[in-house]
Amino acid sequence: MNRYDETMKVIFLDIDGVLNSSKTVDRNFDYPELDPRNFAVLQKIVNKTGAVLVLISSWKDDWLNEDGTVSRSQEMIRYQLNQFGLDIYDHTADMTYNRGEGIINWLNVHAAESWCVLDDEIFPDYEQLQIVEKLVKTSYMDGLTDDCVNEVILKLMG
């Protein structure tokens, strides 16, 4: 999509504390780092809103191996997303400490009708760049749960 596709709805997606939680490692899933239950909640949101997923997580830092091949991190995330009919549309180009700046820079290139951020943390630049009002804060204890669904839908469809 390009700068002029203003009908796009975007979910800026963190992984840790959103698609997994502090309890995830204790479970016996295909990929213990990721929780299918959190993915099922994300699927509900995407099905209702038609939003695309833009990765903001530090997991994107090793998205590709040094030789340009797909990393295990990318493989795990995409595999699990694909199980729910989802995929990553794009990712931001920032360092972890300036995650909000990465979101704003992405939006400057890819206009969106609406957007929200799914993250379990509030980064300092979220407040500086007024991203907090677009944030749906998850809990690292549980990740993305049904309790978040209506808030995300409201921010995207509002």
Predicted regions and their residues:
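Active-site neighborhood of HAD-like aspartate-dependent phosphohydrolases
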Residues: N2-G50
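Structural motif
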Residues: V10, V52, S114-C116
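Short His-Asn-centered micro-motif
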Residues: L13, I56-W59, L118-D120
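Short catalytic/ligand-binding loop motif for oxyanion handling, primarily in non-cytosolic enzymes
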Residues: N20-S21, D62-E66, P124-E127, T145
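Short amphipathic alpha-helical segments
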Residues: T24-V25, N47, D67-G68, Q128-Q130
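Short, flexible/disordered intra-domain loops and linkers
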Residues: D26-E33, W63-R72
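Substrate-recognition element of Asp-dependent hydrolases with the DxDx(T/V) motif
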Residues: V46-T69
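C-terminal cap/substrate-recognition subdomain and adjoining C-terminal extension
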Residues: E75-G158
